């Protein structure tokens, strides 16, 4: 009896042990699954029961100031052949495709024979070609659709707009600097799916079909861009130059109306061009402006009361500063004679582009005062000109100790050597002369506009901010008084009418401008005796400035190249186009004029 009780009790204990052991294991497993692996299992279940839907979002269109598209998204097709699945002979297939793809029949046949599948016979084919192939319904031919950025004006706007790579990411120009504003973010929508992977009931969510019709509108005027490109392309061809650029600026707002370089590149096929073409050098590369900086120096001397409007200076033809002899227009012959020009008033100094006269004028300013004025203009090693482009524009100037310790530094700076800046910076300084003495910030992006051409956002540090004012705040600094700039503008008109800028004279129209010819630095140090930069800066019309036009030509190679006979004709051609495009009437009676170049 006792044995039976003990045996029964043992069985009860065993059952309880097994029960508690099983319960413990079950609770442990539940704890492991619910607590330790809970997040992982939840995500796994979510991934099995839902799907994240998104669609490709195109880049916003870039257009000029009049809404003309300059960069748009289109569809393109990669065309693949799979001979393994052909129902016809390779010869027949090649005959059907050759005329559409503009490829040789024999070439296509060889491709089909060498491989059995996955042959790319066309890359980024346009939609009209794809439609022709689809219409033929050829088995074994596959079309893979993908977005493509299309630039309808090719080289014309490449330096401004830039290009995108195969991943649709901006690599240069505004495509790069405005990447975040141009590339729309694709919305992610979570939707439930069944066991077969099909959407449950609701179908495709409406959020995926939201469209953005906004356009990134520039200040560029396509008509002026065309005229500028044709003029500079013809200009560098005639003088056999390395490269050239043209900038047209609104002197009151800072809006860039045209910016071109030649030679340029086609952003549709950017990979066919040398990489140095992708650099927007008018905004990045430094050069010594030469005589085009003389009007700026004249304004400094007038504003600082160092000279007066009716002052005269003696131009002895050459002047020695320390160990250096400075002459007038001495770029090709070191033995250039010191021709005496007698006494010149300040207008004659500018009109004749007298280096010696400019040295005498700036000698009336103490070097440290002169240096401070140059810094006021936004020039210096640590001063940057911010633009809408990817890289900042900067300048180069000797440090104040070197500038004030050596007389030669202020002397060569008086005629535009010894300091360096970008073409866009020089255009900004001429805008300052044009608008009454204000330094304004050049810009090229106007804002985001809708299909009714109404501005919605203004660009703020290359990102569109809905909270800031739609009216662009002009960033300007007062440097010169209107009375000073008025005197300089009159002098610039005389340069065109009866001076070195006479190649830009147009009967009936009042134009102001200045030629420039500067030596480039030699690799071994000092200045080159062979390589120069020529330039021409113009203000039109001079009595009511609306346009600042700058042309710079790098390394012209015709005999006796100067700004007057290389860059001058480029600017003249652009002004003629401006008159035609904008229907600008003459402002003075027609005058006869005899051209000459200095």
From Swiss-Prot:
GO terms for cellular component: chloroplast membrane; plasma membrane. Keywords: Carboxypeptidase, Cell shape, Chloroplast, Hydrolase, Membrane, Peptidoglycan synthesis, Plastid, Protease, Transmembrane, Transmembrane helix. Its EC number is 3.4.16.4. The presence of this gene in the chloroplast genome suggests there may be an unsuspected vestigal peptidoglycan layer in this organism's chloroplasts. Its main location: plastid. This is Peptidoglycan D,D-transpeptidase FtsI homolog. GO terms for biological process: cell wall organization; proteolysis; regulation of cell shape.
């Amino acid at each position: 009896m006792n044995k039976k009780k003990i045996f029964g009790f043992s069985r009860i204990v065993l059952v309880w042990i097994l029960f508690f052991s099983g319960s413990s294991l079950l609770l442990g497993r539940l704890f492991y699954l619910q607590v330790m692996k809970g997040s992982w299992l939840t995500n796994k279940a979510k991934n099995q029961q839902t799907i994240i839907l998104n669609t490709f979002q195109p880049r916003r269109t870039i257009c000029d100031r009049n809404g003309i598209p300059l960069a748009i998204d289109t569809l393109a097709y990669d065309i693949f052949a799979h001979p393994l699945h052909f129902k016809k002979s390779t010869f027949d297939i090649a005959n059907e495709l050759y005329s559409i793809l503009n490829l040789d029949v024999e070439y296509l046949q060889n491709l089909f024979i060498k491989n059995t599948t996955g042959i790319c016979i066309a890359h980024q084919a346009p939609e009209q070609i794809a439609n022709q192939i689809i219409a033929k319904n050829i088995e074994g031919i596959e079309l893979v659709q993908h977005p493509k950025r299309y630039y309808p004006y090719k080289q014309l706007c490449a330096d401004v707009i830039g290009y995108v790579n195969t991943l649709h990411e901006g690599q240069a120009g505004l495509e790069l600097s405005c990447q975040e504003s141009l590339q729309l973010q694709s919305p992610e929508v979570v939707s439930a799916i069944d066991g077969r992977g099909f959407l449950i009931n609701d179908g495709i969510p409406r959020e995926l079909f939201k469209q953005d019709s906004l356009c990134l509108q520039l200040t560029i005027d396509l008509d002026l861009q065309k005229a500028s490109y044709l003029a500079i392309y013809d200009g560098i061809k005639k003088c056999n130059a390395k490269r050239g650029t043209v900038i047209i600026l609104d002197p009151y707002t800072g809006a860039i109306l045209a910016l071109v370089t030649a030679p340029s590149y086609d952003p549709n096929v950017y990979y066919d061009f040398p990489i140095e073409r992708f650099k927007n050098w008018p905004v990045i590369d430094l050069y010594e402006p030469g005589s085009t900086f003389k009007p700026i120096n004249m304004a400094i001397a007038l504003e600082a009361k160092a000279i007066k409007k009716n002052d005269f200076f003696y131009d002895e033809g050459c002047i020695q500063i320390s160990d250096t002899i400075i002459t007038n227009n001495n770029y090709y012959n070191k033995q250039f004679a010191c021709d005496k020009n007698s006494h010149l008033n300040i207008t004659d100094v500018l009109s004749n582009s007298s280096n010696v006269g400019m040295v005498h004028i700036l000698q009336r300013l103490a070097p440290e005062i002169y240096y401070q004025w140059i810094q006021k203009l936004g020039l210096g090693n640590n001063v940057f000109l911010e633009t809408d482009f990817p890289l900042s524009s900067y300048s180069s100037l000797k440090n104040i100790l070197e500038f004030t310790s050596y007389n030669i530094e202020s002397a060569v700076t008086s005629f535009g050597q010894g300091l360096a800046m970008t073409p866009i910076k020089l255009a900004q300084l001429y805008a300052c002369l044009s608008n009454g003495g204000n330094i304004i910030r050049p810009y090229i992006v106007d804002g985001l506009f809708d299909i009714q051409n109404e501005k919605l956002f203004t660009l703020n540090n290359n990102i569109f901010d809905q909270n800031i004012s739609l009216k662009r705040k002009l960033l300007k600094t007062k440097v010169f008084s209107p009375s000073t700039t008025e005197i300089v503008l009159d002098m610039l008109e005389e340069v065109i009418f009866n001076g070195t800028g006479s190649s830009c004279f147009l009967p009936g129209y009042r134009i102001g401008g200045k030629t420039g010819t500067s030596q480039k630095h030699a690799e071994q140090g000092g200045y080159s005796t062979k390589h120069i930069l020529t330039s021409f800066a113009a203000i039109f019309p001079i009595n009511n400035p609306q346009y600042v036009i700058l042309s710079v030509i790098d390394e012209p190679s015709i005999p006796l190249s100067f700004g007057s006979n290389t860059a001058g004709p480029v600017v003249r051609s652009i002004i003629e186009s401006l008159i035609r495009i904008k229907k600008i009437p003459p402002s003075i009676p027609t005058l006869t004029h005899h051209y000459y170049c200095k």
